[in-house]
């Protein structure tokens, strides 16, 4: 191989998967600082990819154990929006195929918005089935947020295009005959729950951004309905909306004044 430019070396390293590659053996002997920098970057990327693979494998242990028992339709379930003062609680149920792989998959709260959006599209493309459950602020006020979350989760399961054989749920138990396991911090321990958390989060964020367009004075697209200083000041200045949860403090206290 003739001596390559730094740019050509960069392109080559994007193609090279192993140190055994003859092209890599030539590049590693190239003493130019630019090439050595690229080699160092290549090693770091390989190390990161290996860590992501190990993390993904660790997060697949619940699904793999159930598949070993002959189960195929394993639904991960998670919710988003229990704490906000406005907007719905949104849940998702996701059934993944055995060959599913997205490096870097994690609890949706630990991902950037750009990464969540990208993973959302990838999950949509790869999943066997996705169901979403949405419960309004009015119903939350009627039956309380805990019961509303349960209802949204049951709705998400009902909205799947297949009947799940097992449920992996983030920190909840559901009144259903389907066998289930409740996992504390499940969105960081199970790929199915993690995928569900991303679907639920992106779905709800998009709804809140639409609400932000409808009520520009409230800034919903920024705080997603949570009780930030900006949100509380907007309520004081412009009043309580039908999208607000009247049973949540401090809105409840404002109504009682």
UniProtKB/Swiss-Prot annotation:
Its EC number is 3.1.26.4. Residues 72-257 form the RNase H type-2 domain. GO terms for cellular component: cytoplasm; ribonuclease H2 complex. Its cofactor is Mn(2+); Mg(2+). A divalent metal cation binds at residues 78-79, 170. One of its GO terms (molecular function) is RNA binding. Gene3D superfamilies: Ribonuclease H-like superfamily/Ribonuclease H (3.30.420.10). NCBIfam families: PRK00015.1-1 (NF000594), PRK00015.1-3 (NF000595). Endonuclease that specifically degrades the RNA of RNA-DNA hybrids. Belongs to the RNase HII family. This is Ribonuclease HII. It comes from Bacillus cereus (strain Q1). The gene is rnhB.
């Amino acid at each position: 191989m003739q001596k390559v430019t730094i740019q050509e070396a960069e392109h080559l390293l994007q193609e090279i998967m192993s140190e055994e590659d003859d092209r890599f053996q030539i590049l590693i002997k190239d003493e130019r600082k630019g090439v050595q920098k690229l080699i160092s970057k290549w090693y770091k990327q390989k190390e990161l990819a290996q860590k992501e693979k190990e993390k993904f494998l660790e997060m697949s242990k619940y699904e793999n154990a159930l598949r070993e028992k002959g189960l195929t339709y394993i639904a991960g379930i998670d919710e988003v929006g229990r704490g906000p003062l406005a907007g719905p609680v949104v849940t998702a149920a996701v059934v993944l195929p055995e060959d599913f792989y997205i490096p870097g998959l994690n609890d949706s709260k630990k991902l950037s918005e750009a990464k969540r959006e990208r993973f959302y599209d990838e999950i949509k493309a790869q999943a066997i089935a996705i169901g979403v459950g949405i419960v309004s602020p009015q119903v939350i006020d009627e039956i309380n947020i805990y019961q509303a979350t349960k209802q949204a989760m049951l709705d998400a399961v009902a909205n799947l295009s297949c009947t799940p054989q097992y449920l992996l749920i983030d920190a909840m138990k559901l009144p259903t005959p389907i066998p289930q396991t409740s996992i504390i911090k499940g969105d960081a321990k199970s790929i199915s729950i993690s995928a569900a958390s991303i679907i639920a989060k992106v779905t709800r964020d998009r709804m809140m951004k639409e609400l932000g367009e409808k009520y520009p004075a409230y800034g919903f697209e920024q705080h997603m309905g949570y009780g930030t200083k900006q949100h509380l000041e907007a309520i004081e200045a412009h009043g309580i909306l039908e999208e607000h949860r009247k049973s949540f403090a401090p809105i409840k206290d404002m109504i009682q004044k």
